[in-house]
């Protein structure tokens, strides 16, 4: 058997036709030079993880480990590293220019560092202040000039490792300017400008590196050994450093910060150097997953060509902080049994930090040899948490292929078991295609590693800001997923696949130091919309947390996509181990959680910084001339609370300055709000303007949620009498072809209906669950000394900054405290004064709402499709309005004729003698056929035909009043039950046939009577409408005390009866009913109901921009609860009306109702004074 080493020729990756046959030519790739780059990069990463502290010492150290020791030869190594990995030669002039610039940056930085040392020794020396300012400016300018050269077009990828070094230097320099600037003599504006540059360049540099790293991976076209080398080496030399760039934000990270790198990288397949692999690597990469730690490795041994080798393995792991978890992975390779299985159990305090492998490449046979690539053995070196060495695990034999050549220690000055940089976390397996075996036989393990900064216990420091990626959760919730990180986050990130709110996964942390400890909680996230979630400190309490939008729906994740959101109130950790969970909607991406320790000085500075950011974020520019469109009035109030809670002791001047800016923002907000009485000074208090509402609405002062007045809308027991609040936006305030937005804040609500009405009704029903008081039970100072809400006390921040925006073609997300609805305005007409109606309504018993900070403001001009859509809607609305006008003229004419026929003259002060109640009902019905007298959404708001309806309805009321004046019997229609009637025995008043009240006399001994005052000598007509059931007679008698008695009798009409000439028979009444048709329907029936006079032209003009985009709420209103209107239906068959003339001789008469047998049902009793 012949052992062959380094027999094959180096072939560039982009020339390979079959990546499985790739050759590992380590010598031609200058492995030692690449190892040196890795050592320098790992040392820098360690330095950034441990020592990225404010102060001059950081700059001194950065110079000592990088810029003071690296010369042209070392910079050339950086350039050669990626150049060799991707087989792309950097042109000579680009290389020379890059090295020259890097040397110049080193020289300039050295001069700056020297001036910084001198100034630090004498910080009040103005000459030294001037000198350090000059040196800073020189180095800053040199970096501004050099960095574009280090991203030369066409060479962005091979220049990455030197680009990131220059970027890191620039960020460090700018952080110095922000930290020392005022002590150097720089003014506040200049310092703030440098800070803004710092934040902008963190994003710019991060995105550049991540973009070109990912493009470099894509260029390989698939996973190969060279792909793994590039992923590993460029992650170490570029992305690990980029992941720590955000820590240069000194205002966000003013103290030492503990970061973790959770990314996973791969060492080369364990194969003899120089031997072609002939193994498939496409399935080597692991899918994104929660970070795990190796707990058990079982290796199976096979034999091929007489060589015992690693044939397959099984792995078990656990998640972070959960010793009891056991993740078992499927078998990799085969469970061969040429020797007994090697079982390796790793204690939770142990780490495999190094492997020494024994690969072999064997060629046997003659003309057609068999080539075998296998691993004969591996020594696994173990480190313990207490920095002690541990006995290694040995699988069969130790080799010379050292993982340290690819993953060197981060600290060469200490023993390897202390200074190591990575821990083994997993192993996968590559094998030759079956079709090539046995002539080409390969069984090769591939190890994956994580950085040692990612601790297995999620320790939270009492004195440092602790960053913990959420992929270090110990469980993954259903519907949540881990996705590949964008490259600049130091690992993978998490999100949810389900559109509904759901959990992300449970994170367990270990609190170090003395207990209890208090921390501010921050989350680094990205979001495609203004969203909200819930942060749970298990088992309780829960905190609402906002995720304001940071990116568009179709945008890629960039560094600028990520932001920090903070719980308003610090939390206190009282146990050595704590657990947290996070509930988020789809479209929110979570990178990490941050624990910021709280102390008095730091807390004051932190609060000031947060307030400054919040205030500056209100405006469109630094001069505070314009307010951002998406800044709500409620948000301004919350920012005002932040400012008011600043410490007078630590930052009184800054507090006053910020307070003035917030007041200016509030004035700008008021100025753009088109609503009147935006602070709810009164309801129904301003004539023809301001808010109108039902009497049960209350205005309440500020509380722990609202800084200003808000309104409470209670439920109602009858949907025909809803609770309502409305206001009209006058046409004069609106601009043509413009979109407007109604928005506000809902503390809680149930069945709250919100309308915007112009050409159509924009309608939403919003249910927002409340949580009661914001103050935890443990907080005793939630009330101020004068009874006011203490908004500075710790509270549960359940009010998320979520936009419930209902736009064209989008679904509105309910159950959010913030809401907004849009409406588009077409052409404006001051004469027509259509305006926009804003309506809030509740029509259920369980309904309720507390709302405030309402705004109606201009959003944007309409263009393109939106403009065409509103023009179309406007035209449809006007066409239907014309149809309505035509039909209204017809209906009005008929109704007016019916009304006029009731009276003797045009003064409408006297009814005709033959006018009866059926005629008035018939006329009233015709009046109520007038459409659009009131808005169907809320019938207290006048519609387009309100004037003519009110005109005729007023005359109908007059007719009722005159008729009531003629009828001297009180409550003769029994609408008020038995009021004014004397009762003997058992009788009932029942409501029949849709609101008709009738008197039911079921027993012969029962009697109903009423004493009536009359004018002696005048004539009266007694008119009774009634129905007799069963045998016997029903009688209505009129009489004086002793004499002058008359009566009307009712029976089943089985036989033809002869009545006096002054009575009306059954047939006569039926004829009257047909003539007057004393029934009518609701005055606000839907548009689809046609008028009887012209049923072929319905007036349904509830136009919408898109028929499916708006709720067509303008169809029907079945409630007739105002203007005294009742829906009288015709009498059922069998009822008859009878009359008699009566001339009393005294001032009192008695009306008595009774029966002889069966049941007597009386609809109405009238005693009418005859005309003289």
From Swiss-Prot:
Similarity-based family: Belongs to the delta endotoxin family.
Highest classification ranks of the organism: Bacteria, Bacillati, Bacillota, Bacilli, Bacillales
Any GO BP annotation: symbiont-mediated killing of host cell
InterPro entries associated with the record: Cry1Ac-like_dom-VII, Cry_V, Galactose-bd-like_sf, Pest_crys, Pest_crys_Cry1Aa_dom-IV, Pest_crys_dom-III, Pest_crys_dom_I, Pest_crys_N_sf
UniProt keyword annotations, A-Z: Sporulation, Toxin, Virulence
Miscellaneous field: Toxic segment of the protein is located in the N-terminus.
Protein name: Pesticidal crystal protein Cry1Ha
Superkingdom to which the source organism belongs: Bacteria
Role noted for this protein: Promotes colloidosmotic lysis by binding to the midgut epithelial cells of insects.
Keyword Ion transport carried by entry: no
GO molecular function, one term: toxin activity
């Amino acid at each position: 058997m012949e052992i062959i080493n380094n027999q094959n020729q180096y072939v560039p990756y982009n020339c390979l036709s079959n990546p499985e046959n790739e050759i590992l030519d380590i010598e031609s790739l200058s492995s030692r030079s690449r190892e040196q780059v890795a050592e320098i990069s790992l040392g820098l990463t360690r330095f950034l993880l441990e020592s990225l502290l404010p102060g001059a010492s950081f700059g001194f150290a950065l110079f000592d480990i990088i810029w003071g020791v690296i010369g042209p030869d070392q910079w050339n190594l950086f350039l050669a590293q990626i150049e060799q990995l991707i087989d792309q030669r950097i042109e000579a002039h680009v290389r020379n220019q890059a090295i020259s610039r890097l040397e110049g940056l080193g020289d300039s930085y050295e001069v700056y560092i020297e001036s910084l040392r001198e100034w630090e020794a004498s910080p009040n020396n103005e000459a030294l202040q001037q000198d350090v300012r000059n040196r800073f400016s020189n180095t800053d300018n040199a970096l501004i000039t050099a960095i574009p050269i280090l991203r030369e077009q066409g060479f962005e990828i091979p220049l990455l490792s030197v680009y990131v070094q220059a970027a890191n230097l620039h960020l460090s320099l700018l952080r110095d300017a922000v930290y020392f600037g005022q002590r150097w003599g720089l003014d506040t504006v200049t310092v703030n400008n440098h800070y803004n540059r710092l934040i902008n360049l963190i994003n710019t540099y991060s995105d550049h590196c991540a973009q070109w790293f990912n493009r470099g991976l894509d260029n390989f076209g698939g996973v190969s050994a060279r792909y793994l080398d590039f992923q590993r080496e460029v992650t170490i030399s570029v992305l690990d450093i980029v992941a720590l760039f955000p820590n240069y934000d000194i205002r966000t990270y003013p103290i030492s910060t503990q970061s973790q790198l959770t990314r996973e990288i791969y060492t080369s397949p364990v194969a003899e150097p120089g031997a072609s692999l002939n193994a498939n690597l496409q399935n080597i990469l692991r899918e994104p997953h929660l970070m795990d730690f190796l707990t058990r490795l079982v290796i199976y041994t096979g034999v091929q060509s007489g060589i015992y080798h690693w044939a397959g393995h099984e792995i078990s792991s656990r998640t972070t902080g959960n010793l009891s978890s056991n993740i078992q992975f499927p078998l990799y390779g085969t469970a061969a049994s040429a020797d007994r299985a090697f079982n390796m159990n790793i204690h939770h305090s142990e780490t495999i930090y190094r492997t020494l492998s024994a690969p072999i490449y064997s060629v046997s046979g003659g003309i057609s040899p068999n080539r075998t690539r296998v691993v004969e053995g591996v020594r696994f070196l173990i480190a313990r948490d207490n920095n002690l060495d541990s006995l290694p695990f040995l699988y069969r034999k130790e080799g010379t292929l050292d993982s340290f050549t690819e993953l060197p220690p981060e600290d060469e000055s200490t023993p390897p078991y202390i200074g190591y940089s990575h821990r083994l976390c997993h192993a996968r397996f590559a094998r030759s295609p079956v079709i090539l075996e046995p002539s080409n036989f390969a069984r090769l393990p591939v190890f994956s590693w994580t950085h040692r900064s990612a601790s297995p216990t999620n320790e939270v420091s009492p004195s440092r800001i602790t960053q913990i990626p959420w992929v270090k959760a110990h469980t993954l919730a259903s519907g949540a997923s881990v996705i590949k990180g964008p490259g600049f986050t130091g690992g993978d990130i998490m999100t949810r696949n389900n559109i509904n709110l759901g959990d992300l996964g449970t994170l367990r942390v270990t609190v170090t130091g003395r207990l209890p400890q208090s921390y501010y909680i921050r989350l680094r996230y990205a979001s495609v919309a203004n969203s909200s979630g819930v942060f749970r400190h298990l088992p309780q309490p829960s905190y609402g947390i906002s995720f304001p939008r940071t990116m568009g729906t179709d945008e890629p994740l960039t560094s600028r996509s990520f932001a920090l959101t903070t719980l308003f109130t610090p939390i206190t950790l009282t146990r050595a181990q704590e657990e947290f969970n996070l509930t988020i909607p789809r479209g929110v991406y979570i990178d990490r959680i941050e624990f910021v320790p709280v102390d008095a000085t730091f807390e004051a500075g932190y609060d000031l910084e947060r307030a400054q950011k919040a205030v500056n974020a209100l405006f469109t520019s630094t001069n505070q001339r314009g307010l951002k469109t998406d800044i709500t009035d409620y948000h301004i109030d919350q920012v005002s609370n932040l400012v008011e809670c600043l410490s007078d002791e630590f930052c009184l001047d800054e507090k006053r300055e910020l307070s003035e800016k917030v007041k200016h923002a509030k004035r700008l907000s008021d100025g753009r709000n088109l609503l009147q009485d935006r602070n709810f000074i009164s309801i129904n208090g301003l004539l023809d303007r301001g808010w109108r509402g039902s009497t049960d609405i209350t205005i309440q002062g500020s509380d722990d949620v609202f800084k200003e007045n808000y309104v409470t809308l209670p439920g109602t027991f009858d949907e025909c009498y809803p609770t309502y609040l409305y206001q009209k936006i006058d046409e004069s305030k609106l601009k043509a072809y413009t979109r407007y937005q109604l928005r506000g804040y809902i503390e809680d609500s149930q069945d709250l209906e919100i309308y915007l009405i112009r050409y159509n009704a924009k309608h939403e029903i919003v249910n927002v669950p409340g949580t009661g008081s914001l103050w935890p039970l443990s907080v005793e100072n939630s009330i101020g000394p004068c009874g006011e809400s203490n908004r500075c006390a710790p509270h549960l921040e359940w009010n998320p900054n979520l936009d419930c925006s209902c736009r064209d073609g989008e679904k509105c997300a309910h159950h959010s405290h913030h809401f907004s609805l849009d409406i588009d305005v077409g052409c404006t007409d001051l004469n027509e004064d259509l305006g926009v109606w804003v309506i809030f309504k509740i029509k259920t018993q369980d309904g309720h709402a507390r709302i405030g900070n309402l705004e109606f403001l201009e959003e944007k001009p309409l263009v393109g499709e939106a403009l065409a859509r509103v023009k179309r809607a406007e035209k449809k609305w006007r066409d239907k309005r014309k149809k309505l006008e035509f039909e209204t003229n017809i209906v009005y004419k008929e109704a007016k004729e019916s009304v006029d026929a009731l009276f003797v003259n045009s003064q409408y002060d006297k009814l005709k003698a033959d006018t009866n109640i059926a005629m008035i009902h018939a006329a009233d019905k015709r009046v109520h056929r007038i459409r659009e007298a009131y808005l169907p959404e809320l019938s207290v708001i006048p519609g387009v035909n309100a004037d003519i309806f009110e005109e005729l309805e007023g005359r109908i009321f007059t007719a009722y009043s005159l008729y009531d004046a003629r009828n001297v019997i009180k409550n003769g229609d029994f609408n008020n039950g038995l009021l004014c009637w004397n009762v003997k025995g058992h009788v009932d008043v029942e409501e029949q046939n849709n609101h008709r009240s009738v008197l039911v006399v079921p027993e012969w001994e029962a009697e109903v009577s009423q004493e009536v005052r009359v004018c002696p000598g005048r004539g009266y007509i007694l008119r009774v409408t009634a129905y007799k059931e069963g045998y016997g007679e029903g009688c209505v008698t009129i009489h004086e005390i002793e004499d002058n008695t008359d009566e009307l009798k009712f029976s089943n009409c089985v036989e033809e009866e002869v009545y006096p000439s002054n009575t009306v028979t059954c047939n006569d009444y039926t004829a009257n009913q047909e003539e007057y048709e004393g029934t009518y329907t609701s005055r606000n029936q839907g548009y689809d109901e046609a008028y009887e006079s012209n049923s072929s032209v319905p007036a349904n003009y509830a136009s919408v921009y898109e028929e499916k985009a708006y709720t067509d709420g303008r169809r029907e209103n079945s409630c007739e609860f105002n203007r005294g209107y009742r829906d009288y239906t015709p009498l059922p068959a069998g009822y008859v009306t009878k009359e008699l003339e009566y001339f009393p001789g005294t001032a009192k008469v008695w009306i008595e109702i009774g029966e002889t047998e069966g049941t007597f049902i009386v609809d109405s009793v009238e005693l009418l004074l005859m005309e003289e």
